[in-house]
UniProtKB/Swiss-Prot annotation:
Cofactor: NAD(+)
Function: Involved in the metabolism of galactose. Catalyzes the conversion of UDP-galactose (UDP-Gal) to UDP-glucose (UDP-Glc) through a mechanism involving the transient reduction of NAD.
Lineage: Bacteria, Pseudomonadati, Pseudomonadota, Gammaproteobacteria, Enterobacterales
Protein name per UniProt: UDP-glucose 4-epimerase
A molecular-function term among this protein's GO annotations: UDP-glucose 4-epimerase activity
Record text on subunit structure and interactions: Homodimer.
UniProt organism field: Salmonella typhi
Pfam families given in the database record: GDP_Man_Dehyd
UniProt xrefs under InterPro entries: NAD(P)-bd_dom, NAD(P)-bd_dom_sf, UDP_G4E
Gene this protein is translated from: galE
Length: 338
């Protein structure tokens, strides 16, 4: 298939592009490089074994997207592009709504004009808000996300659902993922946050290589086994595989298809710290800090629907997530070159 991947040079996008190329698909990457670096592109080509086309541009440029869809005869779109830092979204709500919501509106408007009606959307478990029961199941009503980031993901889900209802021939997959971590097993591709990492695993990795002094563990008085927050961590390679499988199985299958992509088990912050310490062979310096507003004690996915309908399930453990992250970070302590 001929696939447009928006945000394809970012963390999850780049790993997905490698899997698409390895599966024989033709890939066009659209990215404005605000959260990624151009130097990942030759890595994608080398690991994927095939050349992807790269277009530097913004998701909000509808004319550019229309041109790409026509010129490359695109069959399907995998939509990663957007801003993704929860804390930053609270400080910059307008930027988040503009990029994530308006950007998606521009994308699907261009798709409609070009008669491209297969879309895989990178959603998030944040759309569930605070649920009374765990694990989270796709049939749960969506909640009230705490941040503009989470709200933007929910808004886009609602927009795409309304679009498909009005134009039933569309096939739209809403992939709700939990906490992506890990790196390509080659050690040549991984998460390279711009500035201070917002997520746990890359922060631990930077502590391990000496870029950060200590990890702040927010809250050690939660009603969990060790008192720290529990989340569902999924290896980025399993997540990439999930996108490829969803794209291949749902092409031209009309409807809105919602799937949780997660490991289906919860791991605490200290579980992750201990796994990483084992991977790098040294203790990770950490200290406890007060809880953060809006953080939930524990949640994880019920991913049985993706197993049942897509024949997709995770194959990589928390130890492998830590090992692959350490392999990447130790080989590239400063991330990608500029």
């Amino acid at each position: 298939m001929r696939v447009l991947v928006t945000g394809g040079s970012g963390y999850i996008g780049s790993h997905t592009c490698v899997q698409l190329l390895q599966n024989g698909h033709d890939v066009v990457i659209l990215d404005n490089l605000c959260n990624s670096k151009r130097s990942v592109l030759p890595v994608i080509e080398r690991l994927g074994g095939k050349h992807p086309t790269f277009v530097e541009g913004d998701i909000r440029n509808e004319a550019l997207i229309t041109e790409i869809l026509h010129d490359h005869a695109i069959d399907t779109v995998i939509h990663f592009a957007g801003l993704k830092a929860v804390g930053e979204s609270v400080a910059k709500p307008l930027e988040y709504y503009d990029n994530n919501v308006n950007g998606t509106l521009r994308l699907v408007s261009a798709m409609r004009a070009a008669n491209v009606k297969n879309l895989i959307f990178s959603s998030s478990a944040t759309v569930y808000g605070d649920q009374p029961k765990i694990p989270y199941v796709e049939s749960f009503p969506t909640g009230t996300p705490q941040s503009p980031y989470g709200k933007s993901k929910l808004m886009v889900e609602q927009i795409l659902t309304d679009l498909q209802k009005a134009q039933p021939e569309w096939s739209i997959a809403l992939l709700r993922y939990f906490n992506p971590v890990g790196a390509h097993p080659s050690g040549d591709m991984g998460e390279d946050p711009q500035g201070i990492p917002n997520n746990l695993m890359p922060y631990i990795a930077q502590v391990a290589v000496g870029r950060r002094e200590s990890l702040a563990v927010f809250g050690n008085d939660y009603p969990t086994e060790d008192g720290t927050g529990v989340r569902d961590y999924i290896h980025v390679m399993d997540l990439a595989d999930g996108h490829v499988v969803a794209m291949e199985k749902l092409a031209d299958k009309s409807g809105v298809h919602i799937y949780n992509l997660g490991a289906g088990v919860g791991s605490s912050v200290l579980d992750v710290v201990n796994a990483f310490s084992k991977a790098c062979g040294k203790p990770i310096n950490y200290h406890f800090a007060p809880r953060r507003d809006g953080d939930l004690p524990a949640y994880w996915a019920d991913a049985s629907k993706a197993d049942r309908e897509l024949n997709w399930r995770v194959t990589r453990t928390l130890d492998e997530m830590a090992q692959d992250t350490w392999h990447w970070q130790s080989r590239h302590p400063q991330g990608y070159s500029d």
